[in-house]
């Protein structure tokens, strides 16, 4: 998938560089990291460095500014976006038709990344708080509205790919819940995704969303989840670990263990055989 960086979303909207880092850059980098998980290709204009992050400062001036050199976090953030000023650049091979017109909000945007995206995969990534931060971002091409998926926060791309059947159930869960209360990175292959049918996936997703939204005290007392210690044996790997299970449906269970503020998912139970043993 080709995703274009929307340079029009840098319109000098941030009051200063601190505001840019706090209210613009953090969420933007979250989207970039999500894109990396799906090997998406980020394309941009070759002159993106000249667009303004504040009324007086450009992206280029921010990247070369040593004002924040003492702050490791800001240096890491800068490193994450320095690629915006490097190849690949789409304007070396533009797909825009010379005979076509491209407008946004009655403004001619020919030559911009949103215009280019309307001729490619129709996905852009943008900074927040600009006139072109809307989602969908509607481009009028030859008097026809072309809605672009506008990625302004992490999670949007994952949901889009999942709803369009472009990623597996496993990929969806691992990315969707990365860094949250549920962790799917240590699944036991013997009781993992192969036991779940396509028609059953949304039951699991609904329960996982609920689990993610509740506090741990609510999880422990929620009658629907019925979260409790599992007293049977899942396998020799987990014999020294206190494992737990919670209810996905009357028939389905999810097994795992608590590690700090996360529930590390070991696997899924769709036939009640494990629960019959503990």
Task: Explain the meaning of each model-derived region.
Residues 1-248, 263, 267-278:
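Basic, Lys/Arg-enriched alpha-helical interface segments
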């Amino acid at each position: 998938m080709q995703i274009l960086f929307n340079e029009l979303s840098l319109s000098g909207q941030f009051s200063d560089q601190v505001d840019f880092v706090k209210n613009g850059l953090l969420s933007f980098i979250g989207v970039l990291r999500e894109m990396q998980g799906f090997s998406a290709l980020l394309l941009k204009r070759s002159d993106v460095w000249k667009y303004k992050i504040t009324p007086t400062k450009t992206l280029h001036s921010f990247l070369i500014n040593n004002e924040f050199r003492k702050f490791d976090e800001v240096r890491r953030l800068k490193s994450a976006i320095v690629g915006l000023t490097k190849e690949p650049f789409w304007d070396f091979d533009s797909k825009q038709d010379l005979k076509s017109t491209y407008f946004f909000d009655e403004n001619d945007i020919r030559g911009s990344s949103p215009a280019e995206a309307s001729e490619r995969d129709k996905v852009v990534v943008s900074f927040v708080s600009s006139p072109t931060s809307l989602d969908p971002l509607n481009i009028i091409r030859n008097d026809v509205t072309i809605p672009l998926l506008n990625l302004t926060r992490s999670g949007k791309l994952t949901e889009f790919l999942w709803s369009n059947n472009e990623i597996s159930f496993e990929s969806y869960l691992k990315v969707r819940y990365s860094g949250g209360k549920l962790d799917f990175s240590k699944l036991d292959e013997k009781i993992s995704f192969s036991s779940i049918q396509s028609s059953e996936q949304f039951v699991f997703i609904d329960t996982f969303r609920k689990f993610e939204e509740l506090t741990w005290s609510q999880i422990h007392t929620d009658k629907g989840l019925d979260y409790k210690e599992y007293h049977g044996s899942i396998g020799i790997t987990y014999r020294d670990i206190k494992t737990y299970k919670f209810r996905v449906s009357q028939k389905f269970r999810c097994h795992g263990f608590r590690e700090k503020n996360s529930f590390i998912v070991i696997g899924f139970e769709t036939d009640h055989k494990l629960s019959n043993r503990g």
